[in-house]
C-alpha cells in the first residue's frame, strides 16, 4: 500500500506543476485472470473478485496523442484453483508505469481510443507455510495494451495486462529454488477524466 501512495503522490505532484493535462481516476475488474508458472507447475486461476483501482496523469503532445504516467493497487492474490504443493495465495501488485493514449477524432461525442502501458510491477505476497516452506514474491515488468471509448470524460476500456513476477521458495531443510509467477488477464475498466488548467 505504501508503494501505491508514493505512486499517487508522484502522479499528483507532476500534475500540480503542469499548466494543462488531465487526471483519470479509474478502476477495473479482471476477466479470466490466471497465474502462469512455466512447465514445472500447474497454472492457477484467480477468484472473480480480482481487479484494481488507480490513477493516471496525461497531457496532450500532439492532437489526439496523450502521454503520461500512472499507478494502481491491483488485488489478485486470492486463488480459485488450489493445487497441492503450490501456493494457497499469490501476490498483489503495485505497478508504476508510463502510458500513451491515442484518441480518434470522430466529430461525435463518442470517441474511440487505443492505449498502451509499460512499467515495473512491485509485487507483495510473501507466505510462510511452516513445515511446507516459505515463499517470497519478487517484482518484474508490467505492461498493458488495448482500447476503449470516451464519452463526456468517462472512459470504458478493455485491455490485456500482464504482471511479471517470481517466487523464491525455501524448504524446511533450507533448500531454495525460484520459479516464474506471471499474472495475465483481460481487464474491463471504467475511469473519469478530470481536466486541469485551461
Model segments located where?
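Glycine- and aromatic-enriched membrane insertion/assembly motifs of diderm outer-membrane
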Residues: 22-31, 41-96, 155
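Outer-membrane beta-barrel translocator domains and adjoining extracellular loop/strand segments
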Residues: 35-45, 79-87, 124-134, 166-176
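Predominantly the C-terminal beta-signal and adjacent terminal strand-loop region
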Residues: 36, 74-80, 143, 148-198
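Repeated loop/turn-to-beta-strand initiation elements of outer-membrane beta-barrel proteins
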Residues: 23, 64-67, 107-110, 151-158, ...
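Short glycine/proline- and aromatic-enriched beta-strand/turn motifs that initiate or cap beta-hairpins
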Residues: 18-59, 100, 118, 125, ...
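Membrane-embedded beta-strand positions of outer-membrane beta-barrel proteins
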Residues: 23-27, 69-71, 98-100, 114-118, ...
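Residues that define the transmembrane beta-barrel architecture of outer-membrane proteins
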Residues: 21, 45-53, 90-96, 110, ...
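Sec-dependent N-terminal signal peptides
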Residues: 4-13
Amino acid at each position: 500500500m505504501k508503494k501505491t501512495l508514493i505512486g499517487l503522490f508522484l502522479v499528483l505532484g507532476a500534475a500540480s506543476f503542469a499548466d494543462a493535462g488531465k487526471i483519470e481516476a479509474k478502476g477495473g475488474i479482471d476477466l479470466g485472470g490466471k497465474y502462469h508458472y512455466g512447465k514445472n507447475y500447474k497454472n492457477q486461476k484467480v477468484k472473480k473478485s480480482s481487479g484494481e483501482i488507480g490513477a493516471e496523469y496525461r497531457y496532450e503532445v500532439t492532437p489526439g496523442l496523450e502521454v503520461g504516467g500512472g499507478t494502481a493497487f491491483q488485488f489478485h492474490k486470492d486463488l480459485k484453483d488450489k493445487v497441492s504443493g503450490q501456493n494457497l495465495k499469490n501476490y498483489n501488485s503495485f505497478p508504476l508505469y508510463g502510458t500513451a493514449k491515442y484518441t480518434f477524432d470522430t466529430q461525435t461525442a463518442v470517441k474511440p481510443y487505443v492505449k498502451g502501458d509499460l512499467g515495473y510491477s512491485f509485487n507483495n505476497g510473501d507466505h510462510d507455510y511452516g513445515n511446507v516452506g516459505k515463499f517470497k514474491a519478487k517484482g518484474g515488468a508490467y505492461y498493458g495494451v488495448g482500447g476503449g471509448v470516451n464519452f463526456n470524460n468517462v472512459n470504458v476500456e478493455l485491455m490485456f495486462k500482464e504482471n511479471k513476477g517470481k517466487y523464491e521458495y525455501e524448504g524446511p531443510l533450507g533448500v531454495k529454488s525460484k520459479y516464474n509467477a506471471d499474472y495475465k488477464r483481460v481487464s474491463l475498466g471504467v475511469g473519469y477524466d478530470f481536466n486541469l488548467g485551461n
